[in-house]
């Protein structure tokens, strides 16, 4: 979707609290969900609820301030014996420091949480790359476009990978 980079930068620049993202799905019971009040403020978060109160999930992209360390130290293992990221988000919500950025429907999020979903996600990425002739999330391409690396550095990376399709892609940028 358009504007993701700006949203990520805004989330990363916040000095206080946490920012997570909300994404609308048709099958929220498979995910951690977030419920909103009438003003769009998060009022509950549940992990894989049997009866979801919302269709908005939290797809696993989190930005936390430094207090996350103190929050994490205070966590207790769940029934599964694990520390849950959902509990971190709930603590920020209780403190009034959780911001949920809703992603519009033009954003694409792919669930890769099962083997079948991972395969399906890979096929979607392949199809988009084949149709557009551009790689998705190519770190060297992004770094070069943003001026973080020089053309010389880009070509050096391409040379190191010259026997691969990826290396040839980098050479053509």
What are the functions of these language-model segments?
Residues 1-38, 64-66, 72-75:
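Conserved beta-loop-beta/alpha segment of the NTase-like Rossmann-fold superfamily
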Residues 5-6, 114, 170:
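N-terminal glycine-rich phosphate-binding loop and ensuing alpha1 helix
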Residues 18, 24-27, 129, 141-142, ...:
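Preference for short coil/turn "hinge" residues that link or interrupt alpha-helices
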Residues 25, 56-57, 160:
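Generic detection of intrinsically disordered/low-complexity segments and helix-coil linkers/edges
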Residues 145:
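Short, amphipathic alpha-helical "recognition" segments used to contact nucleic acids or chromatin
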Residues 148-173:
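Short, amphipathic C-terminal "tail helix"
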């Amino acid at each position: 979707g358009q504007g993701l980079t700006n949203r990520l930068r805004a989330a990363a620049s916040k000095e206080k609290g946490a920012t997570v993202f909300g994404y609308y799905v048709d099958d929220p019971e498979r995910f951690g969900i977030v419920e909103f009040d009438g003003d769009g403020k998060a009022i509950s978060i549940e992990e894989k609820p049997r009866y979801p109160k919302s269709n908005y999930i939290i797809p696993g992209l989190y930005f936390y301030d430094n207090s996350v360390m103190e929050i994490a130290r205070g966590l207790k293992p769940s029934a599964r014996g694990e520390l849950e990221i959902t509990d971190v988000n709930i603590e920020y919500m209780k403190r009034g420091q959780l911001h949920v950025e809703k992603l519009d429907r033009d954003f694409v999020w792919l669930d890769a949480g099962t083997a079948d979903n991972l395969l399906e996600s890979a096929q979607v990425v392949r199809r988009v790359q084949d149709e557009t002739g551009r790689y998705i999330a190519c770190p060297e391409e992004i770094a070069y476009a943003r001026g973080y690396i020089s053309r010389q550095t880009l070509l050096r990376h391409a040379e190191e990978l010259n026997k691969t399709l990826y290396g040839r892609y980098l050479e053509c940028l």
